[in-house]
Amino acid sequence: GLLMSVFLFARIAFELSFDNFYHDSDNLYIVKTGWLKNGVLEGNESRFTIIPIPAAIAEEFPEQVESSTVSCSLFDNSFQLGERQLDLSTVMADTLYFSVLGLEMIEGNPQDLAGPDVVFLSAKSAKEAFGDENPIGKTLRYDFWGYQTTLLVKGIFADIPLNTSLERRPEAIISFPTIGRHLKWNLGWQSGGNYDGYLR
């Protein structure tokens, strides 16, 4: 009885702590999208959006929205370091990802995500890949959809706890220009609705 109560309280505490680790978490919002047909909402709203929507909301409501960011989960998570393969949960993100979500940077400048072939690693992933060596300036090979590129490690961020609403808890964050350059993805209003948008 007592042991079960301890487990139950621990689980409740974990559930109630979701997203509380974000800086000023009460002012962080996920952009949800509803699709209208003839003015009527079709189906359920989705947590996915198209790239320009969060920035357009921030521009339209400057007094309510301080900043916005967009990210996209990638399902090719295979990195090569010499002969070793690392499987890391990967997202691509823009330069405002860390400031909007309030994630802690250990080393590096989020503005580096404006350039191509850049990757930021979580502290745990950096340790897994490079041990006690400083990973900044080191390279990893990344394979996605038949393309290969060499990524330069330019930043380290604090590990994201398990109690997050993020669709994927990133262990590696790749810059949008990396994917856009190789795949020529449409990053505008015709980009499709597979992106996560956040407002602060």
Model-derived regions: residue spans:
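Alpha-helical transmembrane segments of integral membrane proteins
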Residues: 1-4
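Generic structural signal for beta-strand residues in well-ordered domains
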Residues: 8, 21, 112, 133, ...
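Membrane-proximal extracellular/periplasmic loop immediately following the first transmembrane helix
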Residues: 9-76, 190-200
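Short, flexible, glycine/charge-rich loop motifs used to bind or transfer phosphoryl groups or to couple energy/partner
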Residues: 18-19, 55-59, 88, 107-110, ...
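Generic hydrophobic, helix-prone segments enriched in Leu/Val/Ile
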Residues: 21, 61, 79-81, 90, ...
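Short acidic/polar micro-motifs at solvent-exposed secondary-structure junctions
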Residues: 34-46, 69-96, 106-118, 142-151, ...
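Residue-level marker for well-ordered alpha-helical positions
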Residues: 51-55, 92, 99
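Mid-to-C-terminal secondary-structure elements
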Residues: 94-107, 119-200
